[in-house]
Swiss-Prot record:
It comes from the Eukaryota. The keyword Phosphoprotein does not apply. It is found in: Cytoplasm. Keywords: Coiled coil, Cytoplasm. Residues 194-215 are annotated as: Disordered. Its main location: cytoplasm. It comes from Pongo abelii (Sumatran orangutan). May be involved in wound healing pathway. InterPro entries: SIKE. Residues 5-104, 161-185 form a coiled coil. GO terms for biological process: response to wounding. This is FGFR1 oncogene partner 2 homolog. Residues 197-215 have a biased composition (Polar residues). The lineage of its organism: Eukaryota, Metazoa, Chordata, Craniata, Vertebrata. Pfam families: SIKE.
């Protein structure tokens, strides 16, 4: 009788241990199932992100980006050439202004030399006439030079904006490619991990079933 009770207690103890093992296995299965569900959700999210990126890439293909960059580069070269021509024209007008000033000084010198022999009144009128004509030329050239400087400044600012835009497009294109590469690699890794975890989970379930059947 005593042996029978001890055997029953031992069997009960062993059964409790097995139940604990099964509980641990069940907890492990639950955790793995939760992890798999999370990975499935992550895969769905990655797929959605890939679709969104594909939509972006479809609407803005690489050829379009390259053509846009080439067009902006051409515009920048045209602006630089125009600025060069404006600078050349400005230098020519400044040279013309210096030539006029030189002619004016030469004319004044002749007038001063002739003033000793000619009527002072006529000399004064000639001086006034030449001064007015010279001032008109100086004002006109100064105004043209100011307009050209302003145009050059505006073109240079526009050229800087175009260069910034090209840099932004290049960075955006680079970022899209990096994101696509990361998502592809992550998706492949998830598939590999899921395959290995599914194999482990199947083995664990099989072992648990075998243990239950033996009991």
């Amino acid at each position: 009788m005593s042996c029978t009770i001890e055997k029953a207690l031992a069997d009960a103890k062993a059964l409790v241990e097995r139940l604990r093992d099964h509980d641990d296995a069940a907890e492990s299965l639950i955790e793995q199932t939760t992890a798999l569900n999370k990975r499935v959700e992550a895969m769905k999210q990655y797929q959605e992100e890939i679709q969104e990126l594909n939509e972006v890439a479809r609407h803005r293909p690489r050829s379009t980006l390259v053509m846009g960059i080439q067009q902006e580069n051409r515009q920048i070269r045209e602006l630089q050439q125009e600025n060069k021509e404006l600078r050349t024209s400005l230098e020519e007008h400044q040279s013309a202004l210096e030539l006029i000033m030189s002619k004016y000084r030469e004319q004044m010198f002749r007038l001063l030399m002739a003033s000793k022999k000619d009527d002072p009144g006529i000399i004064m009128k000639l001086k006034e006439q030449h001064s007015k004509e010279l001032q008109a030329h100086v004002d006109q050239i100064t105004e043209m030079a100011a307009v050209m400087r302003k145009a050059i400044e505006i073109d240079e600012q526009q050229g800087c904006k175009e260069q910034e835009r090209i840099f932004q497009l290049e960075q955006e294109n680079k970022g899209l490619r990096e994101i696509l590469q990361i998502t592809r690699e992550s998706f492949l890794n998830l598939r590999k991990d899921d395959a290995s975890e599914s194999t482990s989970l199947s083995a664990l379930v099989t072992n648990s079933d075998l243990s239950l059947r033996k009991n």
